[in-house]
Amino acid sequence: MTDSEHAGHDREDGELEDGEIDDAGFEEIQEKEAKENEKQKSEKAYRKSRKKHKKEREKKKSKRRKREKHKHNSPSSDDSSDYSLDSDVEHTESSHKKRTGFYRDYDIPFTQRGHISGSYITSKKGQHNKKFKSKEYDEYSTYSDDNFGNYSDDNFGNYGQETEEDFANQLKQYRQAKETSNIALGSSFSKESGKKQRMKGVQQGIEQRVKSFNVGRGRGLPKKIKRKERGGRTNKGPNVFSVSDDFQEYNKPGKKWKVMTQEFINQHTVEHKGKQICKYFLEGRCIKGDQCKFDHDAELEKRKEICKFYLQGYCTKGENCIYMHNEFPCKFYHSGAKCYQGDNCKFSHDDLTKETKKLLDKVLNTDEELINEDERELEELRKRGITPLPKPPPGVGLLPTPPEHFPFSDPEDDFQTDFSDDFRKIPSLFEIVVKPTVDLAHKIGRKPPAFYTSASPPGPQFQGSSPHPQHIYSSGSSPGPGPNMSQGHSSPVMHPGSPGHHPCAGPPGLPVPQSPPLPPGPPEIVGPQNQAGVLVQPDTSLTPPSMGGAYHSPGFPGHVMKVPRENHCSPGSSYQQSPGEMQLNTNYESLQNPAEFYDNYYAQHSIHNFQPPNNSGDGMWHGEFAQQQPPVVQDSPNHGSGSDGSSTRTGHGPLPVPGLLPAVQRALFVRLTQRYQEDEEQTSTQPHRAPSKEEDDTVNWYSSSEEEEGSSVKSILKTLQKQTETLRNQQQPSTELSTPTDPRLAKEKSKGNQVVDPRLRTIPRQDIRKPSESAPLDLRLAWDPRKLRGNGSGHIGSSVGGAKFDLHHANAGTNVKHKRGDDDDEDTERELREKAFLIPLDASPGIMLQDPRSQLRQFSHIKMDITLTKPNFAKHIVWAPEDLLPVPLPKPDPVSSINLPLPPLIADQRLNRLWNTKSDLHQNTVSIDPKLAAKAKINTTNREGYLEQFGDSHGSGAKLGDPRLQKNFDPRLHRLPNTESHQVVMKDSHASKGAPHLPRSNPGSSQPSGAGTSNSGSGALPPYAPKLSSSAGLPLGTSTSVLSGISLYDPRDHGSSSTSELATASSGENSKNQKKSGGLKSSDKTEPSPGEAILPQKPSPNVGVTLEGPADPQADVPRSSGKVQVPAVHSLPVQALTGLIRPQYSDPRQARQPGQGSPTPDNDPGRETDDKSLKEVFKTFDPTASPFC
């Protein structure tokens, strides 16, 4: 039996191995055998000390089950079986040899089990150990049912019954059965294993209940113990339950009660009336309720506060709420007022007790305190000189519109100064909102000199320099906000503040008190500015205008304003020098004022830049600006101190801008201020230095307003002012230099209004600076700088500032300033340009616009959809087609041909229309372009081998074209003829249109043209060449190139019908191309209908050509080619080529060979038929039909 068993066992092992991918099956068998052997080995020991082992096992198993209780459902817990299997494997050999008899009894069932597990393992290697256990258990149950019938063990039967009774009993019986199995030898062991299996089967219900606890056997236990008994494993579930029950018992709250320590009790309870009451209950937040471990036997005292939920209508806690509900006294009833709720009142009308009286008094006092607090705040505001706003109605915002708070004149000054202290934030908000309002008022034509000066006077005042203040306001205000530049250029449209500026210009003595005029000055500025006598107020208004326009645009008025500020000691002294100069300056300001006002939006940036040059101290200009627009002034004063005409305007524009674009403007403002400070340092004038003290004042005042708008800008302005004051003192003459720069910048910024702004600026500049010299210089500089500085938006501000500098220099000496201005202009222009690149206005330079316009002019005379820039490129690209040819070749023929024919039809129609309507222009322009195109085309066609069609001129080119065509032909036989026609088409289109069309035409022609395309193109081109040249007035080479492209397409149709004809007709490379591509495309398009379909897709003239044959296509091709050349549309030539080339496919053979010598005879009939063919084509052919159909 031993041998046979071994043999059987070997077979079984082999079978297992055969069914398994891994050795798992065999290992499992060995492991199980080893397990059984181990059990047998330990039987004696177990007999001697069964109870001892049982206890130890039970303890270990219980621990293991406790550990794996949480792993019941995870199959991974089955890994423990791996360990058990491994442990069994260790004893496999010894057990196998020793227990051969045992294997007889156990071998078959185990083999079955092994096979099953083996098959399972085969399907899933990684999990075979894990899931093998579960399957193994099932197999055990099966085995016990099938094979264990003979072993009806009393213990087992009793065990199965007991299992159902109780988990604890089941565990005990299982252990007993396990012990008995250990005692029994051979059959007894197999019986026990069967019992175990059957026990598992009996316990499957339990396992399900436990969710297969057996799956998660303790991995931690020794392998032998784990693996010793399957039943033991199965019983783990019950064990787990029992253990879990015990564990739950330990975890029961009852247990916790017992565990509570005095410390724990003291932590969670409070002694209340001699009892330890749950402190959470007393606080009204014990969530355990009746289950709480601590006593809740206490009456909760209500907190002496009204329940806010009860007050709002409903409290979910009801009587349990710790806050007062209806016990709270009714304040209406007890205060003597009538309680409309009466008996239904939710609050108590009972007599007041000491407690309730305290509560009532507290409530009433709270209301009084609120009222008193408001009154105290209002009193504080009044003390500070701030008129408190009326209490807004409920639902209205806290901040009313600024006008409600105060007028922008005197009240604004006080208000702003107060804001600078404690109310800076609110004022800044008001000013931000109000400034645009003021600008709008100026635009509307209102007085708002005061408002404007305070809010947005900078632009308007200066704008008004030349026109009356009212005119300045109306025109300036409207232009100031957005189109400062353009309006600045137009004198009438200066900033609304310009009237103030005007007065400043008018009054030689600018108002010295720039800072005082700031709030009140603006209103006065309108009147006093008009009056030379009121220097201070005009200065104030000027300062806002200077910020807006006077300071910016009238470099001199700006300086005058600034100078008065700078020279506040001698208000008007700087400007008093010459009222005429003042007027000129004001005019200049007015001219630049629109730019100023426009810049006001960009102003704060440019203002800083221009302020130093215009004002010796930015603070001066800031003071002026602040006067004009205290809130905005902060930003705009920077412009003011920068107060180059344009920059100031830029700054002024930003005055409203701070509200609109504070972040961006501030960023630009900082940039411009820094840049312009450098410029100002170079161009700062001495007079600017004079008002440095006032600048400080203005800076302080401005700082207050600036604080309202933003502390960062304020600090920057202060720093810039200090720096610029020194620079201005040092570089007062340099401001003259900056004047040309500023005008340029102003013009650049007024680019949108280039026509208006330059003119206006020119006029004021002329007035300010020796109307002829300085003005033309300024204008030229302004124009040039625009173009030069057009890159930067800040440059406009600088140009405006330059104008102001010019005005100021006119006072100080325009000649000197102009000299320095030129040098400074270059430096400043460079700086401005670099800075301007950062500004979004960089793209607006006049030069840039002019170039596109000139290009547009080219387009206009061409009147084609072709971009004129391409013709320039086309010239270069004409030679590029060689390189481009490979590009179109890679394109898919069907796609490119389909796409190209449709556009070419449109293009051909356009070309025909354009050719007819503008034949003269096209002949001239196209003759120029076509000549170039013809030359290029001849070269390209020669390269492509189309010269054969054209004749001698093309003959030389054909040689060049032949190798190219051949090269292209060799690698891409199908596309080479197309490339030839494409090259021709591209040449035509390049001559007229440019390189970009070449690839289009090439793919289009290559796809539709086919092998016959190149041949027919060369053949048909000679006849078409004279027609194209004569009709289009283009050189024969050009028209022939187009014709060659067309002939290429015509051969396509013919090529589809007969490729051999194409090959014969084609000469030189054309014949080769026809043969190669003809074979390819003829095979692709063996049917003539595809060629026809292609033709209809192409323009009508092309279709006509295809229908009528070489003559028609030739005639059409010359026309279309001429047209194509005129518009320089590559798509048109391609279309013509695609459509015409195909019809000429067969003809081109004939045409090319004889056509080269005599193309004209073909052209005559072709022309006649072309017209018909065009009409017919449009009628008969479907433009959407695929050329490959």
From Swiss-Prot:
InterPro entries: Su(sable)-like, Znf-CCCH_ZC3H4/6/8, Znf_CCCH, Znf_CCCH_sf. Residues 13-28 have a biased composition (Acidic residues). One of its GO terms (cellular component) is chromatin. Residues 718-741 have a biased composition (Polar residues). Residues 27-73, 353-385 form a coiled coil. Residues 1-12, 29-46, 961-973, 1164-1179 have a biased composition (Basic and acidic residues). The keyword Hydrolase does not apply. It comes from the Eukaryota. The modification Phosphoserine is found at residue 1158. The keyword Signal does not apply. Residues 505-525 have a biased composition (Pro residues). Residues 461-478, 639-659, 1009-1020, 1056-1069 have a biased composition (Low complexity). This is Zinc finger CCCH domain-containing protein 6. It comes from Homo sapiens (Human). The lineage of its organism: Eukaryota, Metazoa, Chordata, Craniata, Vertebrata. The gene is ZC3H6.
